[in-house]
Amino acid sequence: TATEYASASTVYLRTHRPDSTSLTASYQNGSFGTHKLAATCSYKDWGFVDAAYTRTKGNYPFSYHTQYEDTTGTRRNSDITMFRIEGCAFWKGLQWHTYYFNSVRGLPGGIVRRLSDTYTDVGREWDRNFFSQLTYREEFGRLGLRGIVKYANDYLHYRSDYPENISVHSNNRYHQQDVYGAAAASLRLGRFGLSASTDLRWSDLTTDVKNFHYVYRMDSKTSLSAFYSHNGLNVNLSGLYTHVSDHTYGTTKPMSKMTWNALASYTTGPWTLRTFYKSVFRAPTLNDLYYTLVGNRNLKPEYTKQFDVGVVYKTDGLD
């Protein structure tokens, strides 16, 4: 997709299609009151459901050595409760994947100088993540088609109310939504090939932070790529157009950029000479711009250029 072309580097993960029908369940426990339950049910070629629950009390001991004291303490408010469930269904070229995650965790207070200076353990964090995605992939001779539709919903609640330092008081809730759609097509004509893709993403951010104004973003990307392969020579050229616009109180300037990529390699015998050039444009995310403490509305887009030349030698004489 165009979003994949836009990344400086990409790791491709594809959900495994079950090759057998099975049902498994497990229970584990460990130190510091840790308990874990997990279960997986899969049906050959059709889909699976996987769930896990984890609970730990934390409260683990630790050694503390400074010029003021040498002692052992116990880390309080370090509990974690987590639940995750996800499922995936397959039918011909269609794949539907749904995921849900919920967690509550404590955030231990920091130590200033002495163990007795430990901040009161009041920090807490609540997370909830959900997404549902439908993917279509099919080939018709030399023509390949791919489509993706995805909806994501994320919630974060962070609270820290240290009586020792009221200046770091925080009790914020963030809610983000993301709707994403992508379509891509590829055509192979002998030694030549063409591919085109376009992505459209709508995302928003709401929070109860004082003086925060609702913001949503429209992000579109379009890419066109051509490649040639013959007698050990491989060449790929591509262009990507990105347009990002934020809509909130006041005015924001849209961001647009055209970037280019080129890759070439030549193989003769055990030797391969390869090189590539890639320019990358990345707009700050809504988190980068609008989150409390870590957000900075004055952030500028990132521009990256990558260039690489390498030689590879392969031989069957070495294991």
Name these PLM-found stretches:
Residues 38-40, 60-68, 104-116, 148-150, ...:
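Outer-membrane beta-barrel translocator domains and adjoining extracellular loop/strand segments
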Residues 20, 40, 44-125:
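Periplasmic-side early beta-strands and strand-to-turn transitions of outer-membrane beta-barrels
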Residues 21-25, 45-51, 87, 92-98, ...:
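Transmembrane beta-strands of outer-membrane beta-barrel proteins
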Residues 120-139, 252-319:
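Outer-membrane beta-barrel signature, preferentially recognizing the C-terminal barrel domain
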Residues 1-27, 37-39:
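N-terminal periplasmic accessory domains that precede
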Residues 29-31, 53-57, 91-93, 100-104, ...:
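Transmembrane beta-strands of outer-membrane beta-barrel pores
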Residues 39-43, 85-91, 132-138, 181-187, ...:
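Residues on the lipid-exposed face of transmembrane beta-strands in outer-membrane beta-barrel proteins
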